[in-house]
Amino acid sequence: MIALLQRVNKASVEVGGETISEIGKGILIFLGIDKKDSKKDVEYLADKVVNLRIFEDNNSKMNLSIKDVGGEIMVVSEFTLAGDCKKGNRPSFDKAMPPEEAEKLYRDFIDSLRSKGIPVKEGVFRSFMHVSLINEGPVTFILNTR
């Protein structure tokens, strides 16, 4: 499971010209799900995200978690994160989990974050979306359960 995290001042998702989801200060997560991923990956990643100290304290040191700052999380499915660009010039998505199975783990990830007391918004699984964000920093991390 691959998560690209961006610390944001705000983020929103638009589908079909309509804003369907938005957050203020928090973390925007693009989530890619690999064929080898399982519930174990979901729990590991959710725990890591919730406890990762990527927000600055009063001394401008990254020392605060999303819980500490009372922030929100937006999760957007992003199967291209499971893409492989090593061979040729066209990405291969053979490692990406089929959408029917991936959606369950996507939902499990969102549910796990919510169970930890974090407000979570989401994109629309398997939809073409316009994602807007205002980075804070910028601060970007890639978390991989492999």
Swiss-Prot record:
Role summary: An aminoacyl-tRNA editing enzyme that deacylates mischarged D-aminoacyl-tRNAs. Also deacylates mischarged glycyl-tRNA(Ala), protecting cells against glycine mischarging by AlaRS. Acts via tRNA-based rather than protein-based catalysis; rejects L-amino acids rather than detecting D-amino acids in the active site. By recycling D-aminoacyl-tRNA to D-amino acids and free tRNA molecules, this enzyme counteracts the toxicity associated with the formation of D-aminoacyl-tRNA entities in vivo and helps enforce protein L-homochirality.
Record text on subunit structure and interactions: Homodimer.
Protein name: D-aminoacyl-tRNA deacylase
Keywords (A to Z) from UniProt: Cytoplasm, Hydrolase, RNA-binding, tRNA-binding
The UniProt record lists the keyword NAD: no
Presence of keyword Transferase: no
Endpoints of the signal sequence: none
Motif annotated as Gly-cisPro motif, important for rejection of L-amino acids, chain positions: 137-138
Single GO term (MF): tRNA binding
Any one cellular-component term (Gene Ontology): cytoplasm
Subcellular location: Cytoplasm
Family: Belongs to the DTD family.
Main subcellular location of this protein, as a coarse class: cytoplasm
